[in-house]
Amino acid sequence: MEHPKQPKRESLKTLWREKRAVTLVYIFLRTSVLLVLLAQIFNRNFENVFLCVLTLILFTMPSLLERKLDIDLPNTLEIIILLFIYAAEILGEIGAYYVTFPNWDTVLHTMNGFLCAAIGFSLLDILNRNSRVRFHLSPLYLAIVAFCFSMTVGVLWEFFECAMDQFFFFDMQKDTIVHDIGTILLDPTGGNHPVVLRNITDVIVVQADGTKTALGLGGYLDIGLMDTMEDLFVNFIGALVFSIIGYFYVLSRGKGKFVKRFIPVANDTVSQENTTSGEETSL
């Protein structure tokens, strides 16, 4: 008598063998998020409840992309993506790591630039290896497009942060205290000549009802410009680093072991590589 469920069992065993590290990390992070979710429900902090639910949804994205695009994500890349989501949403927002650790946001944006360049690079590399696609990009163009893809994602994210700040006052674009500013709005002639104010030590806010409040911050409050520029710059660094690494990876015909940990491949390519290695072993 045949057992129709046997192939499924075998496939689960294979999946566990190949994705053991990813599965363990996923279970640990998901359990942690669920515990945080219960705590936030108990505290009636529904904004954080939403962040927890969003995190759980984002955790499913890597496996969803693998199924929909018929690709295989390297374990290292998948684990980093999961840790990145957890670090940004749970630790950063709910755990207030953005405030506790001043460079937390900078590190995440650098990782974002690196990861997005890897994803953009891999998508083009998959198309390059597909015989049904009628164009073929050189290694240099692959690197340039991957870099541009990563920077575009970074810019779109800054648009999102700005929208959240404007409409919901989330303060996602973190503030910076500056001591010198230059602005044409203070030009007494109404011209285009910037007036420079130096050594600012405090700012007094006057509200519509006449209430005056000295902020006592020790300088002028910049409400996001410096943070946005820093985020885009470190995104640029991350994207540039991976684009250079990816360029040499393609030149060497995919022999770099380090880069392979970050570049998804089409499943038919994986099958071909496994078949080839099997033939070499038998010989």
Question: Language-model segments: what does each one mean?
Answer:
Residues 1-19:
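Short, Lys/Arg-rich, polar N-terminal cytosolic tail immediately upstream
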Residues 42-56:
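Structural signature of hydrophobic alpha-helical transmembrane segments
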Residues 53, 72-83, 106-109:
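Cytoplasmic-side transmembrane-helix entry/capping segments in multi-pass membrane proteins
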Residues 59-63, 84-89, 146, 150-157, ...:
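Alpha-helical transmembrane segments of multi-pass membrane proteins
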Residues 94-105, 154-155, 159-242, 247:
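Interfacial helix-loop-helix junctions of multi-pass membrane proteins
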